Amino acid sequence: MEFKVILPILGFEQIEKYKLEKIDDVFFKLEGGDISFTLINPFSIKPDYDVIISDADKEKLNIKDDSNILVLNNMIVATPLQNSTINFASPIIFNFDDNIMGQVILENAQNYSLTDPLANYIKGE
């Protein structure tokens, strides 16, 4: 599904549209131009993840109480996979009702890391 960028991904402000592809219940692929990101469903590994979005960002992304949204986090994939890191402080929010998206900095970002190791949430083999 294609989404129009309302709040750009930091460092990639020139990209105006992205295509989101579900890989499985945990991982997603986000493509725009020549750029590709691996995204992760934060609730699959951190059920207590608390997403507090500013009123200004909610307005820009047209988020209401009944909006069909998806929250995903950017992941830097490494080998082995346990060495990958996740940005929990600034998730990417997808509004499926309006096909718009944006990266936000959480109101409670101080509670989260930009580079939280995946190893903190999965068991090694």
Predicted regions and their residues:
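Long, compositionally biased stretches
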Residues: 1-48, 66-125
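Short aromatic/basic micro-patch
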Residues: 52
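Short active-site loop/helix that positions an aromatic residue
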Residues: 55-65
